[in-house]
Swiss-Prot record:
The keyword Metal-binding does not apply. Probable sugar transporter. This is Solute carrier family 35 member B1. A motif (Di-lysine motif) lies at residues 316-320. Pfam families: UAA. It comes from Xenopus laevis. One of its GO terms (biological process) is UDP-galactose transmembrane transport. The chain crosses the membrane at residues 9-29, 49-69, 81-103, 134-154, 166-186, 202-222, 241-261, 283-303. GO terms for cellular component: endoplasmic reticulum membrane; Golgi membrane.
Amino acid sequence: MSSAPASGGLRLLVCFLGVFVCYFYYGILQETITRRTYGEGEKQEKFRFALSLVFVQCIVNALFAKLLIQCFDSGKTDRTQSWLYSACSLSYLGAMVSSNSALQFVNYPTQVLGKSCKPIPVMLLGVTLLRKKYPLTKYLCVLLIVFGVALFMYKPKTGSGDGDHTVGYGELLLLLSLTLDGLTGVSQDYMRAHFQTGSNHMMLSINLWSSLFLGAGIVLTGELWDFLSFTERYPSIVYNIVLFSLTSALGQTFIFMTVVYFGPLTCSIITTTRKFFTILASVILFSNPISSIQWVGTLLVFLGLGLDATYGKGSKKPSH
């Protein structure tokens, strides 16, 4: 009978390593693609094709979800209305594009920490749109996260004002991304509650709609041709973009697996741990400077996330 706990422990290890390795490498690839300089001398340029990058990511995610449905959910019928998927996909892709675009103005630790604050918009939108009620511990955890972010973002005045505008623009993009993440979360909660939408069907349909919108966008704006020209000049980036998209899709699969077998609490702890070490790796590998007060803010944010994962779920709807 001891084989059951052993197999459960092995499965947890596989899920942990899957999430950790996929998203750790995903973070390194994202920073490599968006923040490095391409070319030499006066012909140096940066990657500025956030729409095209997310388009490739959505295509790979959709293909991966289709494969998962064929393998595990082939007998299940999805009854979710298409307009819900299309509406959700707009906030979903907007959040991803804003997040990737923000990396042109802020460093990766700032982006990761900003994206770690999802509980804030989810809670605010839950209270205002869905009239949800949360326990006091949830509000205290969110306050701790807000205080940590405020410490991280605090910059004492130095005599020069250079770069203030770009940093502010990057932070606005992160704020937009967080707001859209919150709207996506509210939409997904509605679909699960009213249509019992499965995670693989949701992943497939949202990414298909996102691919459709983005495909039209990059063709109409002409970004597609500039993106293809850029990949022709620097073919090595194609390898990084494909790996970036594959690690994203595979990482989502391990997250869903963790939620199914071990619940959202374990998944939250794993993803929170992963984000902290991603920031640490970014500081070491890409020499992103972080002051001591920013480290304090970072620790407070992850402490708030950990406490929220453990104690902030006290408000459950009664089961019938």
